[in-house]
Amino acid sequence: MTNVFVDSRRDLRERAFQALFSLEFGGDNLTAARFAYTYDKNEEEEAELPLFLLTLIQGVSDCRREIDKNISIHLKSGWTLSRLTLIDKSLLRLGLYEIKYHKETPERVALNEIIEIAKKYSDEKSSKFINGVLSQFVLERK
């Protein structure tokens, strides 16, 4: 039986963030996605992974160089991508990917979802920072 909340888009974004964070330490996309999706579920190892989850993880991986370039452009003078925490970097990558490349999700929805996940996994200062960087990117696209 599938729990609607557990497979909500927000939950899948959160699991994509967890997978992207773990990939900073090595591994492959599918293994990271499978672990992030099933680690707290009573599901078999062979549970079908939601397409949305796989799309986010693979999309960030495929576009990572361009995403990192866009993030770097929007950082304040003196800041570099390497100076960011892995949590903030992973959230920015996921948010920017969904805003720029995943056309099914309205920009403002993607922005709000990443900010809510940031509030859960980071501190208030970081969630405001992520909001500022991604909001600036959204405003420049208009």
Swiss-Prot record:
Which keywords does this chain's UniProt record carry? RNA-binding, Transcription, Transcription antitermination, Transcription regulation
Q: Name one GO molecular function term.
A: RNA binding
Q: Which InterPro entries does this UniProt record tie to the protein?
A: NusB-like_sf, NusB_fam, NusB_RsmB_TIM44
Q: List the disulfide bonds.
A: none
Q: Which SUPFAM superfamilies match?
A: NusB-like (SSF48013)
Which Gene Ontology terms describe the biological processes this protein takes part in? DNA-templated transcription termination; transcription antitermination
* Gene Ontology terms: cellular component: cytosol
Q: Which domain of life is it from?
A: Bacteria
What is the protein's known function? Answer: Involved in transcription antitermination. Required for transcription of ribosomal RNA (rRNA) genes. Binds specifically to the boxA antiterminator sequence of the ribosomal RNA (rrn) operons.
What family does the entry list? Belongs to the NusB family.
Record's protein name: Transcription antitermination protein NusB
Q: Which organism is it from?
A: Streptococcus mutans serotype c (strain ATCC 700610 / UA159)
